[in-house]
């Protein structure tokens, strides 16, 4: 049995294949967050059906489809690469067809679709955060330099609309941790250990949860 492919098949999506075609200094290769890691996040109950999650660097949309399906929350995926974004849109079309019946002419602008999972083709640092978005998910999608700008945007959104905001980081790099510790508004909440999921643990297999105070 292959858990990754089994869940993809269950959701009628294709997210398993690695893609480094657009990797550069500021943008990491596409690598899907493992489903068993997302299971641990769901079990922690840090995310509820009332949350609106933004997946920064969403790739082909796995996080959005799975959280929307298992938790019932809304998820918006932000992806800078137009080719990978198009694959996320194709996954959305096949997922909706699988769950709701035949779908004709799915729009590339998925904001037009009445679905719990949507996608937007824009760089994360240029994305304008909406007041109802309160959970932000990261799996090292871009450089610490871009992360710094994104964090500032989230903090500004908090100033404009005070609300509970959580930031979720899977397998954060040392550069990410350093950037997070440099932002005084961020408060470390908890760490979910994921190392038992891997035979060759690197010691950073965890989910770190922060909130804005």
Please tell me what each predicted stretch does.
Residues 145-206:
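C-terminal substrate-binding/active-site "lid" region of AdoMet-derived donor-dependent transferases
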Residues 61-65:
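Glycine-rich SAM-binding Motif I of class I
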Residues 50-57:
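Conserved class I S-adenosyl-L-methionine
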Residues 83-84:
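Conserved short alpha-helix immediately C-terminal to the canonical SAM/SAH-binding motif I
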Residues 74-79:
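Conserved SAM-binding motif I beta-strand of class I
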Residues 133-146:
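A short SAM/SAH-binding and catalytic strip from SAM-dependent methyltransferases
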């Amino acid at each position: 049995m292959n858990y990754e492919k089994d869940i993809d098949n269950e959701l009628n999506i294709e997210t398993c294949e690695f893609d480094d075609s657009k990797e550069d200094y500021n943008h990491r290769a596409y690598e899907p967050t493992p489903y068993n890691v997302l299971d641990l996040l769901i079990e922690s109950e840090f995310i509820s059906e009332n949350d609106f999650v933004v997946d920064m660097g969403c790739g082909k949309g796995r996080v959005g489809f799975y959280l929307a399906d298992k938790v019932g929350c809304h998820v918006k995926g932000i992806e800078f690469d137009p080719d990978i974004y198009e694959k996320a849109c194709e996954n959305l079309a096949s997922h909706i067809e699988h769950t709701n019946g035949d779908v004709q002419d799915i729009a590339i602008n998925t904001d037009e679709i009445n679905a719990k999972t949507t996608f937007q083709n824009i760089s994360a640092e240029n994305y304008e955060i909406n007041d109802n978005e309160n959970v932000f998910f990261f799996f090292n999608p871009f450089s610490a330099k871009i992360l710094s700008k994104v964090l500032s945007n989230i903090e500004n959104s908090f100033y404009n609309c005070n609300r509970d905001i959580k930031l979720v980081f899977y397998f954060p790099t040392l550069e990410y941790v350093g950037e997070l510790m440099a932002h005084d508004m961020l408060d470390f909440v908890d760490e979910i250990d994921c190392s038992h999921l891997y035979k060759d643990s690197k010691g950073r297999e965890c989910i770190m949860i922060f909130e804005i105070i």
